Amino acid sequence: MEEFQGYLELYRSQQHDFLYPLIFREYIYALAHDRGLNRSVLLDNVGYDKKSSLLIIKRLISRMYQQNHFLISVNDSNQNKFFGYNKNLYSQIISEGFAVIVEIPFSLRLVSSLKETETVKSYNLRSIHSIFPFFEDKFPHLNYASDVLIPYPIHLEILVQTLRYCVKDPSSLHLLRLFLHEYYNWNTLITPKKSIFAKSNQRLFLLLYNSYVCEYESILLFLRNQSNHLRLTSSGILFERIRFYEKIKYPVEEVFANDFPATLWFFKDPFIQYVRYQGKSILASKDTPLLMNKWKYYLVHFWQCHFYVWSQPGRIHINQLSKHSFDFLGYLSSIRPNISVVRSQLLENSFLMDNAMKKLDTLFPIIPMIGSLAKVKFCNTSGHPISKSSWADSSDSDIIDRFVRIGGNLSHYYSGSSKKKSLYRIKYILRLSCVKTLARKHKSTVRTFLKRLGPKLLDEFFTEEEQIFSLLFPRTSSTLKRFYRGRIWYLDILCINDLVNHE
């Protein structure tokens, strides 16, 4: 953010917080290019960095200044009068630059909030594994949980409208509408994997989608925090940011005439917890199923009336935590009783007491993981290892390095499993698939190839943590056994591996 704060101070005084003029500045595209070189593993490099040049950007800006050529050609699929023969490249450059521009208000707000709260900038706060200690602390005391799939907006205009609270510049919003109308079918968001997360413009659409989710969560969490005060009072929600909330004395129907078709009564639940990752969230509560059903139907009406997004109640599943497990972030988590026997002695009498405590159990999803490995041809659907034929043309070191990297990533991510037996089975599949791939390359049998290499090949699959612990402690020590049995949550995991995401 510091790299363009100087530019922002200049344009604030001249343009009254307008972001639109920045689209004509070359340094914006230079920033987008530099960020593309250092982008996270979530965003794949699709060739924009190789094709981008200062000459192309200058040509693009000069064409944007020529307003006579700013024409919409809906029927032309690959070229138009504005972009000529480089429509795909120009559209990608504009989307990258526009994403940087629209991120400016969010970045400024983030910097100011970090200064106010004196929060230390740390990647540990972004770790996915930090969610599971929260589960261990809160969920054993709760009774019910609902899996909530956040619906995708049907129309791109919904995504544009969510930006109007942060982007005060109408010209920027109109430019975004024009860009989306020119290059995307407004009605294709029903199949989000093909449109909203297209690799060529993933940064822009992630920004739009995250702003939509942020808008939804800001209202939801506000209601959750205020629900304790609304036990006996009918209250209306005004979804404009200026008058966000007020208590009312007149009937609720008058307030909800535009947003809700019926009276909405709030309810008290001080033990409700909310967790989300990407488009899936979990709403857990200690109260009765009736209360969870109220939240369920409230969310459905909320999406339909405020965001104009159609959602069915069947998309929200309510389960009892003690009887059902929930799938979140690649783990199958459940609450099970942990009974410990305590011996108590009073004078001459002694007796045993069973102390039952609830504990979070995080299991490795063996069946979905075998399905993921079968999709990428590491094994068959039964879990029997097979050779990776597409890698047989690579060098031996490259083949081994690929398998070791996949096994290490899975071991690192699933280090929090309560039972490691299923994880060891997956590592065995990867080891044997690696050996079969090498044997196929050298036109040999697996047994002959293993005899030639010896146990050194299998030692490559031990993670760095396992190697360090095996050197520090003997294999029979209790510390090493606790390492293999216990759960470890790492604070450096920022995204889910493709094999972990089974959907």
Curated annotation (Swiss-Prot):
One of its GO terms (molecular function) is RNA binding. Keywords: Chloroplast, mRNA processing, Plastid, RNA-binding, tRNA processing. Transmembrane segments: none annotated. GO terms for biological process: mRNA processing; RNA splicing; tRNA processing. It comes from the Eukaryota. Its main location: plastid. It is found in: Plastid, Chloroplast. GO terms for cellular component: chloroplast. It holds the Pfam family Intron_maturas2. InterPro entries: Domain_X, Maturase_MatK, Maturase_MatK_N. Usually encoded in the trnK tRNA gene intron. Probably assists in splicing its own and other chloroplast group II introns. Belongs to the intron maturase 2 family. MatK subfamily. PANTHER family: MATURASE K. HAMAP family: MatK (MF_01390). This is Maturase K. It comes from Rosa californica (California wild rose). The gene is matK.
